[in-house]
Amino acid sequence: MSKPGGHSRHGRRDGIDPVLRSRARRRALQAVYAWQISGGFAKQVIAQFAHEQAHEVADLAYFENLVEGVLSNRAELDTALTPYLDRSVEEVDAIERAVLRLAAYELLYRQDVPYRVVINEAIETAKRFGSEHGHTYVNGVLDRAAVEWRKVESGASGA
């Protein structure tokens, strides 16, 4: 629903509700975490969480895009993250690993989402679900990665 002036009921011209996007990211984290632990198939994981998510208002299309994107691009995401980690991807705590994979997907494949939003959401998600200091690790990794992955947007000189 739009208000006069072309803004949605959320005050944004693009019609995106940031609250619903945040919920979708949290649910995507849970789905990616479950996938990492169980090794299930992407369609099964998405179907399970999409069914559960039906009771919680969230951006279902965005949730599905995140989960499918991470699961189908896992190897590329892990390769992209590796230079910014102080250990192998598999040695990173499972929650922080899921947060990093989701954020890496958004930073690399969802150029429509500002890098600051991606990093802030990842930090908040890591605070909520991760280890006591996991959010600081996530922040450090993503800050360094964003300088390279989003050079134009972050204003990095490349030097």
UniProtKB/Swiss-Prot annotation:
GO biological process, one term: transcription antitermination
Stored Gene3D superfamilies: NusB-like
A single cellular component GO annotation: cytosol
Keyword field: RNA-binding, Transcription, Transcription antitermination, Transcription regulation
Entry superkingdom: Bacteria
InterPro entries, alphabetized: NusB-like_sf, NusB_fam, NusB_RsmB_TIM44
Presence of keyword RNA-binding: yes
Molecular function terms, GO-annotated: RNA binding
UniProt record similarity statement: Belongs to the NusB family.
Function field: Involved in transcription antitermination. Required for transcription of ribosomal RNA (rRNA) genes. Binds specifically to the boxA antiterminator sequence of the ribosomal RNA (rrn) operons.
Name of the protein: Transcription antitermination protein NusB
Source organism (scientific name): Xanthomonas axonopodis pv. citri (strain 306)
Gene giving rise to this polypeptide: nusB
